[in-house]
Each structure stands twice: as C-alpha cells, then as structure tokens.
Amino acid sequence: LYARFTAKFLRDDGVLPAKAGEPFKRLLAQGLVLGRTAKSSVSCAYLKPHEIDSATGVEIATGKAPAVSFEKMSKSKHNGTDPQQVVDEHGADTLRLFILFKAPYDDALMWEDKAISGPARFLRKLWAAIGEHIDKRGDGSDPDVINGDVTPSSLTVLTHATAERVTSALSTSFAFNTAVSDLMKLLNAICDAPDRGSADVRASLQTLVRLLAPFAPHFSAEAWAAIGDDRRDDVFEAGWPAADERVLRYRAVPFVIQLDGRGKGGTSVTQKDMDELDDEALEKRIREAGETVKVVGKRNVKAFRVNREKRVVSIITK
C-alpha cells in the first residue's frame, strides 16, 4: 500500500515517468496464519494453553477433550504465537523456511510449533553434509562435463533439474513450498551419493546453497563461506545457478506400465531417448527395461504398445 502511494506521489511530482504509477507487476495476496484453537466442550469458552493437560490433551477443569480447530490468531482465542520466541529458539532462517514450506503463499497456513522441527532438521542436515564433504574431499576431478557421449551422473541431472524448477518457482509460479521441497529432495540425493567427497557432490552442494539463499540468507552465507569456490565472495555475489539444457536431456521421463488394463508400476527413459529414438527403437528400449521385464515375468506377451504422448506402456497377455 505505502509503496504504491510513494510511487504515485513521485510520478505526480515528476520524479518518475508518467507510466511508472504501479511499482509492481502482480499482487500476491497472502493467506492467513491460523493458530491451533481449543474450545471447552462444556462452556464453549476459548481455553488458554495452561488450561489443557499437556499429557492427555483434556481440559483440566472438566476432564473432557476440548474441540480443537485452526482459526485466525487473536488474543481472545489464546492461539497466538510470538515470532520472537521462535526466532530465539530456531533462528530467523528456520522460521522463514517453515512459513514458505508449510503451505502455498495464497493458502491458509495452519501454524503448529512442532512442525518447525522439519525445516530445522533440513538445515542441520545440510550443514552436516557440507562438513562431511570437506572432510572427505580428495583431489577428485571436475564435475560431469557433457562432451560427446559422456553421460552425466544422476545427481548432476537432478541438480540441474532442481535449479530449473526453483528458478521457475521464484519467477513464474511462486510455488515457494514446492521449491523448498525440491531442495530437500536434492539434499537427500546428495546424502545418498556413494562418494561424499566427489566433485559431483561439491558442485551439487554449491548449487543447493545458492538456490537456498533467497529462502535462508543467513545460513546460506555461512554455508557458502565453507563450500564456495571463492570463500571471499558473498553467496549473493556468486551468481544464480543456471540449468544446462545438455544435462536436462538426461532427466527421466516416466511411463506408466499397464498389464492387461491394470496399472503395474512404471519405468522411464531419458528425454534424450524421447527426442532421438523413433517409435520402434523407443519400444525396444522400454521393453528391455528392468521394470518392464519384471512386470512381464514369464507371461506370453500378445501385444506391446507404447503411447509416446500419454506416456503409457500397454502390455496384453490374455
């Protein structure tokens, strides 16, 4: 509101151009933060936290379970949360990450103190992964370089795909919660890597820290000081990671497998296969995939069809 007023004032005063009256391209209306609310099943009065037995969850005065719901925070409903207490206990970055991850920005956010432990664990896990990489790092080689027929590792492909999705979430869809979820999935993949000291892991950690910076700036600054190529640079001066289209060609394209009309799991091929293989070659690739072979077993296949557009594999044995 004040930014729009200031922009219009400066425009009318001739400081800004005549077309500069609106400082924002789009208004993102945020959802309400709802607090856990307890209501007495006897008096229907809103209960204070100390009026409820923390062990059993029943109202101390009546011994009966209260009616619990999520409502707009207010003093009269005794369902408010002091953000400063959360910051003191978990840190500002953890609080910010929790708010962005808990729900889409335009949906109501149901506040639960216990749920903040999830983002807190994520940051601790990332910090531990950085420390483990530094301890195990050897001379190594450069991260996967896409030259000729060299195939990037699955971790490298996931890293570039994550960079693409997070960039889209911040610039187009504003799906901040899914962006944080993608970062968590990338960290899980990093922690599952067989060689934690490899150059691939280092490149993925560096990308993850830079993608995390808008969500957790203080943590990312400290993490970049430990893992960045030039430790003197701030994470916000390191540049935004861009997804390499040559790497993205190797990401998995899922296909659903239907056996005699019933879903039986799925398989996948790379985007490169989708682009380069004709229908016959693509069918051969999917037919020989381990997931397909497992589904078919010893059955006698009468028909095997691949629908490239719908990404469905139809197998008829009866």
Please report, for each region that a protein language model flagged, where it lies by residue.
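Helix-rich, typically C-terminal accessory recognition domains appended to large enzymatic cores
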Residues: 1, 12-24, 85-267, 279, ...
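Short Ser/Thr-interspersed hydrophobic loop/turn segments at strand-loop and sheet-helix junctions
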Residues: 3-7
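Short, conserved secondary-structure transition motifs
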Residues: 29-39, 213
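Short regulatory "switch" loops immediately downstream of catalytic or recognition motifs
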Residues: 35-42, 133-137
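Conserved phosphate-binding loops in nucleotide/dinucleotide-binding enzymes
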Residues: 37-92, 106-117, 246-249, 263, ...
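NTP/phosphate- and nucleic-acid-binding module
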Residues: 145, 255-318
